[in-house]
Amino acid sequence: MAVNVKTQDFEEQVAKASGPVLVDFWASWCGPCRMLAPVIDQLAAEQTDVKVCKVNIDEEPGLAQRFGVMSIPTVVLFENG
């Protein structure tokens, strides 16, 4: 299952992770985000070597701005922070 990440735990969950981390920036009102969600959840279940996280941009607009998210869904792969 994908981990919901907040600003206060982003460093621990993503930046300091020991392996690759896939982050899905999404919003509940976004139709394409809702279509992508089952794929992200399936990926999280099947790929144990990649940590999968989700960031709700309505709840965490600072994270979206920090990483230059201009549209959603946006998926970013972090490696070594």
Question: Which stretches of residues belong to each language-model region?
Answer:
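Proteins that catalyze or organize thiol-disulfide redox chemistry
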Residues: M1-K51, D58-N80
